[in-house]
Amino acid sequence: MKLAYWMYAGPAHIGTLRVASSFKNVHAIMHAPLGDDYFNVMRSMLERERNFTPATASIVDRHVLARGSRKRVVDNILRKDKEESPDLIILTPTCTSSILQEDLKNFVDRASIISDCNVIFADVDHYQVNEIQAADRTLEQVVRYYLDKSHTLDQFVTDAPSVNIIGILTLGFHNRHDCRELRRLLKDLDIRINQIIPEGGSVEDPKNLPKARFNLIPYREVGLMTAMYLNKEFGMPYVSTTPMGAVDMAECIRQIKKSLDILAAPILSSKRVDYESYIDGQTRFVSQAAWFSRSIDCQNFTGKETVVFGDATHAASITKILAREMGIRVSCTGTYCKHDAEWFKEQIQDFCDEMIITDDHAEVGDIIARVEPSAIFGTQMERHIGKRLEIPCGVISAPAHIQNFSLGYRPFLGYEGTNQIADLVYNSFALGMEDHLLEIFCGHDTKEIMTKSLSTDISPIWDPESRQELGKIPRFVRDEVKINTEKFARRKGLLNVTVEVMHAAKEALSA
C-alpha cells in the first residue's frame, strides 16, 4: 500500500468489484471505511448504465472499531440477500480495512449457513496485488467455486466448433466494443460462442464452460488464470494471442484453427471455412489499415518518433502495429503491469529502442520529456503529460477517462479495430501540411493568454505581471475571470490591467 498522486492500477478491491458487477445478479459487499466506496460512482459515471451498480459498502466506523465487525458484516449480507435475491454475494475488504486483520472468512461461513444465496470471500492479498491481478484471481475463484460445487459435470463437448470468451468485464478499455467485434469474427469463422464471462454472464454459466472446444483470452490482464485452470482440470486448449492489428489477427485465427484441430470433430467446420482465404480477404478488403500503411499519408510518418505506455496487452500490441505495420519508430515503450514484465519484454524486444517497466507516472513523464516524441500513445496520464509538453497523445489503454468510454462503436480488436487504430494513429500526429504551415508561421500562439473580444470597445491592456497572474488561474474559469476584470477596468475608466486591478475586480464581484 502506498500514497500516490496517480495510480495506473487501482487497489485490489476494485478488481474484485469489477468482476462481481460484471456478472448478472451478483452483489458485492466491501468492508470499507468511508472514502474507499467510490467504485459505485466511478462505474456509474464511466459505463453510463441505467441500473445501479450492485455493490454495497459495509462501513467501518468507530462503532465497528469498538465492538468488532462480525454483526454488521453478517447483517449486511443477510439484508442484501433479502432485498436483492442475488445468486452470489462476494465479500471483499479494502486495502485500508485489511489493516484490522479481521477473520472475514469466518463471517462469510457464518452468513452462508443462514442466507439463501451463495456467499464467498474474495481470496485476494490486498497488500501484494493490484486491481488487475485481483480481478484475474477473483474470476478464477468464482469459476473454480461453481465447478467444484457442481459435483457432476456434463463434460461432453459440443459437436460444432465452440468457444468461451473469458475476460470481458466492466470498466475495461473498449471491452464491450471489442466483444461485439469478436462475436462477428467468430460468426464468420462458423464458431459458436458457448459462454462469455464475466460481462453479462450468470454465475451458473461456469459449470457449462467445459462444453466448449477452446477458450479465447482477448486480454492477458484478466482471464488467463481461469484459462490455465480449465486447461489443467479439463484439458481445454486456450488462445491468448490478442487479435489486435493485421499480423496478430492472422496469428490469432491460425491458433484458433490449431486449437480446433486438436479434436477430430471440427474438421467438418474447417471444410466450410477456409481460414487462410478468410485472413487474406479480410486483410485486403475489409481492413483499410493494410492499404493505409502503404499510402503516402502513412509514409509522412517516416522518421517520426513515438512513445507507447499502457497495460501489457495494449502497449505490446500498439508497439508492434506502429513498428511492424506502419513503419513508425517507437523510441520507448513500457507497461505498468510489472507482474507480466517477462512476457512484455519478449513481445516487444525487436520493435523499440528502449523499454520501461514501471508504475511511476513521473518516470514515464521524464522519459517523454527527454525523447520529445512527435506523438504519445498511452493512458489518461500520458494524455495529461502530453498536454503539459504540447505533444499530441492517443489513449490506447486503461486507465482512461469518460471520453474513452464512447457511446459509438470503436473496437480495438478485430479487423474493424485495425481501422480504428489507424485513425487514432493518423489523427494523433500533426498532419504533413499542418506541420509545414506551423513551421512557416512559427506555430500556434497558444502559450499566450487570449485577449481578443467580440466587444467593439477598446480592451484594456494587460501588463506582463497581470498576464502571468491570469495564467495561474485554472483554465475552466480563466476566461470568466478575464472578462469580469476587463468589465471592471472599463467601468472604472482604466486603460491598463495590473495585478492590483485584478484583485480589486475580484473584491467588487464578491461584494
From Swiss-Prot:
Necessary cofactors: [4Fe-4S] cluster
Classification via InterPro entries: ChlB/BchB/BchZ (IPR050152), LI-POR_suB-like_C (IPR013580), Nase/OxRdtase_comp1 (IPR000510), P-CP_red_C (IPR042298), Protochl_reductB (IPR005969), Protochlorophyllide_Rdtase (IPR016209)
Catalytic activity reported: chlorophyllide a + oxidized 2[4Fe-4S]-[ferredoxin] + 2 ADP + 2 phosphate = protochlorophyllide a + reduced 2[4Fe-4S]-[ferredoxin] + 2 ATP + 2 H2O
Main localization, broad class: plastid
Pathway assignment: Porphyrin-containing compound metabolism; chlorophyll biosynthesis (light-independent)
Binding positions ([4Fe-4S] cluster): 36
Residues the record marks as active site: 297
Molecular function terms from GO: 4 iron, 4 sulfur cluster binding; ATP binding; metal ion binding; oxidoreductase activity, acting on iron-sulfur proteins as donors; oxidoreductase activity, acting on the CH-CH group of donors, iron-sulfur protein as acceptor
A family per Pfam: Oxidored_nitro
GO cellular component, one term: chloroplast
Binding-site residues, substrate: 432-433
Compartment list: Plastid, Chloroplast
Entry keyword set: 4Fe-4S, ATP-binding, Chlorophyll biosynthesis, Chloroplast, Iron, Iron-sulfur, Metal-binding, Nucleotide-binding, Oxidoreductase, Photosynthesis, Plastid
Keyword Nucleus: no
Signal peptide, first to last residue: none
NCBIfam families: DPOR_BchB
Quaternary organization: Protochlorophyllide reductase is composed of three subunits; ChlL, ChlN and ChlB. Forms a heterotetramer of two ChlB and two ChlN subunits.
Protein name: Light-independent protochlorophyllide reductase subunit B
Lineage, top ranks: Eukaryota, Viridiplantae, Streptophyta, Embryophyta, Tracheophyta
